[in-house]
């Protein structure tokens, strides 16, 4: 999709493999029959709306304590797991063993279900055949380097009719060989007794798990396994995910035995499964634990759910009920108080535990075995209601378990996601899902103190995926089911998991540790603006209007002109523009040394030629520059800055074909000369065109239009550069370049060679496309020319790159005085063969979103180390040139405390500092993007559209004052005072200076008037007193004396 950013801000077409899309894709893989079954559950879901119970886990949704997205506890954690952490991988017998009719194995309920319910699936003989190719499985385990292997015993392979009366010798031999091989390799076996493949005989004879007789039969089977294998097995799982056994086996019909619509059966089966597990645990605890010293649990699975509004208690309670009705259904009796959650017991369908049974059931697990995978999220309408959202947040559900069940030790006994069946070894999305899940586990251990002691990646091999049969794959190893030898080929996810195991987590590799240091004192610290819209008339007409006005204070309070009176006026001044005054105040707050903005070509030359020049607009821009220089802020001026919504060309030029017409290049030269002549004495840094490698995207009707427009843009830039070099540089002593959009590219899958090539190809098509002709060879990159030619030969493209004539090659080569780049993010690319008539298809590149990385609201990934790699790549390919980062920033929706932007600035400046100090890249300036924001665009601005400063303003100004990231005890930078503290009162005085001046004048005048009034009042009293004395009669012999 297209982002809503301008050409100066990041915007492109993205492919997002988000969790929501993955859920959608998972639902699409289900058969129509399975989807229809889900409709039966509409009545069941109503039961979950009952209120009454509120467990401790409900606190997990209380987000009143806001946690910043850039808080270390919320970011991807580069750290390692505890030293004794266990790494494993798992399989299910029915999924991988195959050979369902071989060596005496009896049929299971799933064998019948496959043939009766799953159309087009010819049994499990297409499976991985682990029963036959045991050695290949062991080699796969050796490749990964796991410390344990979790597998299940096939009950019908060991006991074909389900009872322990007659063991199948061949099946017994297979499991003994497997266990012996694991012990020999020092791989700990974790054995699951029941992973859904119930012997068919028990289903037909007893009705399966609906019959309580299964409790004793299961205990007999478990006892035999303990006796036979217990000397080599220290970890036992009784049942894998009983919720799915009960709910999908007897409620939705999505699993064997395929019964549906009977809630009584659903809860009866769940009840019997809990009691069966409990009986086996007590059996092991009493009879086998004393000498085998093992541990036993049951694997419980769940989804995770989030309320739409955490301040809506009803939504929160419904989320709690949703978790309790899935995970709590089994966890509460076993890990809790021995009984079902209270709100579930309000219905008459669920069985009751007697007090003795509660005591029997409670505490029958030595650790909490937890499953978190796609089966727990299907179908979505069984776990999601109005006001809720499904989430793949494994960390949160682990916290919920900790709160609900008294901080148990946890083994993640199943975790992973799926890919479509056509994916072979390049399972790139599976890598990111694993990375996300594993890091959430690490965060839970490190930040939340959750006691996770092991992780089971699911699954070792591609195999039968239950209701999805063979339409999805979950294995770390690819298996061609139609081949005879069933070779195990490691997928990218296998390589990745192997690396995780070797590193014991996520040690920091992508970047060196943070460092302290400064940029030089002449470093340009700037801020970038897009097109600066001019004021066509002065905002304040004070002293420019010759008329005198009287304010009618008693009537309508309007101003009335006094006829016949004319006042002396003065010419308008730069300070008369209110917008300039506001802009200068913003620049002063930021303490920048440079300000980059773009001129509006359409306003300066509305007709596109010199026949009509808007001098008022030129004067406005000159005022912007001059007022900034008074403040010590130097300009970098862009002549032409198109955006996605506006090409920025005068209408006559646009009507005549725009950049597809070479006349536009001539018009651009005339326009540039006018700007050099009118503003060049004040401007020393010029950008001709902003992001021409993105502007060409506007001419995307065909790839040839794109390449032609880009070619003409390059010619236009070169002509302007030569014009400046010849006529204006000797006098104005400035520098001219153009700015390129330069995002870095990384292979989305580092284990696939084609992704590495795609990443380099992206850089060639995106950056070298313009950089090679201008900085290097005078011609397009050879990689670009050869790749397009190759696609043409194969009929996959009709693109034709324009050719530079010898004259044009000489014209464009070397027409840059510095390297100006706009960098925003790092793209993770995959090779994808495309066949359209658009230029982007010539790259054969698509993007993948790394869900583990901090991203902005517009999905820009925060990958600071990418800018350092980019700078090193530029230095390596285009020699040691002066480089200006002319735009670097991110969108942040916060109107005041924009924490993502502050984090972004700090980390990207950190990486630029490393490039300068360690890699010796000649970085001359850093310009943050951008000064102000527009109401209709993502919020990239330091100031809001009504000029209110965000907290990033002060943060960036401190970076500038420190000239980087110095150590705390270092001396002040570049003549700065020892303490550069933020003076709130000083800022207020500066901002309110006119009002304060007026107030002082008013108070002074008031004081003078008051003094005069008091003086005259006292004088009058003296005079009155004197007159009174004259009227008093004198005594005889006295005379009046007047002084």
Swiss-Prot record:
Region (Glycosyl hydrolase-1 1) residue ranges read: 77-506
The disruption phenotype is: Mice are viable and fertile, but have an altered bile metabolism: they have increased CYP7A1 levels, secrete more bile acids and are resistant to cholesterol gallstone formation.
Q: Which GO terms describe its biological process?
A: carbohydrate metabolic process; fibroblast growth factor receptor signaling pathway; positive regulation of cell population proliferation; positive regulation of MAPKKK cascade by fibroblast growth factor receptor signaling pathway
- Stretches for region Glycosyl hydrolase-1 2: 515-965
* Localization per record: Cell membrane
Give the superkingdom in one word: Eukaryota
Give an example GO molecular function. Answer: hydrolase activity, hydrolyzing O-glycosyl compounds
Membrane-crossing segments per the record = 995-1015
> Which residues face the membrane's Cytoplasmic side?
1016-1043
Extract the InterPro entries matched here. Answer: Glyco_hydro_1, Glyco_hydro_1_N_CS, Glycoside_hydrolase_SF
How does the record describe its quaternary structure?
Interacts with FGF19; this interaction is direct. Interacts (via C-terminus) with FGF21; this interaction is direct. Interacts with FGFR1 and FGFR4.
- Annotated function: Contributes to the transcriptional repression of cholesterol 7-alpha-hydroxylase (CYP7A1), the rate-limiting enzyme in bile acid synthesis. Probably inactive as a glycosidase. Increases the ability of FGFR1 and FGFR4 to bind FGF21.
Protein's name in the database? Beta-klotho
Give the organism, scientific name: Mus musculus
**Gene from which the chain derives:** Klb
